Amino acid sequence: MPTPHIEAQKGEIADKILLPGDPLRAKFIAENFLEDAVQFNQVRGMLGFTGTYKGHRVSVMGTGMGIPSISIYANELITEYGVKRLIRVGTAGSVNEDVHIRDLVIGQAAATTSAIVRHDFPDFDFPQIADFDLLDKAYHIAKDLGITTHVGNILSSDLFYGGPDAVKVGKLGVKAVEMEAAGLYYLGAKYKVQTLGIMTISDHILTGESTTSEERQLTFTDMMKVGLETLIAE
């Protein structure tokens, strides 16, 4: 039965899914990596597809920007469609001198400026961490593919313009800043499913380097390959 934001019927979404923020990136992945891809959602323009990758049934769906948006879709995917493995594939801004444009960052844990956890646990800070099994798989897959990859803490900010001081954040060893992973990791803990964030550095906050919107939408294929290989890894 469709949800308020996803029009798919039961069985039309695989139990393993990639979650790019940009719905057009979801379309790109479906068209370039999946076989026999079928669209299951276009509500609010948030495109979703199910197909096969190397013989394994997988789905891909956009989530929009920010923790509130990804939380809506992830909640419905988990509770209504039985998705068990969710991997965010998106972009991030580096706050570390050793993390460069187009490098991959795998978020081991995600600090956040969001109050998402405080709504459930107002008296203490709950750590948002990735599923270790998925993280370990993704790291070794990226390493085997020869892709420059960094593993460490990230920051999920509620603000795209403004937010915490990038220099101070970087001095704490944070690799990058993005806007969604902490929400996804929290839902992973809440519902006991596997979650992970794999990001491509699209901008360097310290140096001002950046990539184009077209490049962000249509390239960054290393991240997509690592995400798909991790989705199907046993």
Curated annotation (Swiss-Prot):
One BP term from GO: purine nucleoside catabolic process
EC number: 2.4.2.1
Pfam families assigned to the protein according to its UniProt record, in alphabetical order: PNP_UDP_1
GO CC annotation, single: cytosol
Chain sites annotated for binding phosphate: 21, 25, 44, 88-91
Reaction(s) catalysed (UniProt annotation): a purine D-ribonucleoside + phosphate = a purine nucleobase + alpha-D-ribose 1-phosphate; a purine 2'-deoxy-D-ribonucleoside + phosphate = a purine nucleobase + 2-deoxy-alpha-D-ribose 1-phosphate
Protein name per Swiss-Prot or TrEMBL: Purine nucleoside phosphorylase DeoD-type
Name of encoding gene: deoD
